[in-house]
Amino acid sequence: MLGKFIVFEGGEGAGKTTQLNLVFEWLTGSGWTNRIKGYIQGDYPSVLTTREPGGTALGKSIRKLLLDVTATGNESIDERAELLLFAADRAQHVSSCLLPHLQQGALVLCDRYTDSTIAYQGYGRELDLTLIHQLNQIATQGLVSDLTFWLDIDPEFGLARTHDREQDPEIETDRMEANEIAFHQRLRQGFADLARQHPERIFRIEAHQSDDVVAQQIQGILESRLQEWYP
């Protein structure tokens, strides 16, 4: 695997998307994008930004089904069906987007990946973790992030933030945000457990701080990794 895979994780309102975009701007402005370009094979961008769910054409349709409560009418989504839809989105995303870019040397910035499924469906929905790990293994073909930033925030504070932010124009009412507070507390514990289990990969960032402070912390960690990856 020639490229590097960086993931941004966290609960609702943690600021993942904001920080991913700030990292992309920083990479471009600081010259890293041009430096990485020297490692690219073929006609691929040096830095790719993407997300789950919704990083492919198929994924966009799955994303609306998963997140928009109006997409399925009055019919609720079974928890196992939800899990399988996330797995389907990931399988398509890995095979048609992530692997092709990584194999050509790109630096990939992704908004959510496997840790979200463990936290949301495993801890939040309390589904079987062994089953989730098996599905993740199938969907990812073994692809693991090189670096994950977990933006940790108190669920009540994060949910309050979501009411003030610019909403996804494709999602009328977010299904995940609508869950009870206990769900969000459980998934936060899931991320905490993952961070303890994988300290070499997952970095916890206190996300209640200002965007600028959080960005500086993330960029400081990433700068040292980039020096190692692209000497």
Curated annotation (Swiss-Prot):
Disulfide bonds: none annotated. GO terms for cellular component: cytosol. It is an enzyme of class 2 (transferase). Keywords: ATP-binding, Kinase, Nucleotide biosynthesis, Nucleotide-binding, Transferase. GO terms for molecular function: ATP binding; dTMP kinase activity. ATP binds at G10, G11, E12, G13, A14, G15, K16, T17. One of its GO terms (biological process) is dUDP biosynthetic process. Belongs to the thymidylate kinase family. Phosphorylation of dTMP to form dTDP in both de novo and salvage pathways of dTTP synthesis. HAMAP family: Thymidylate_kinase. This is Thymidylate kinase.
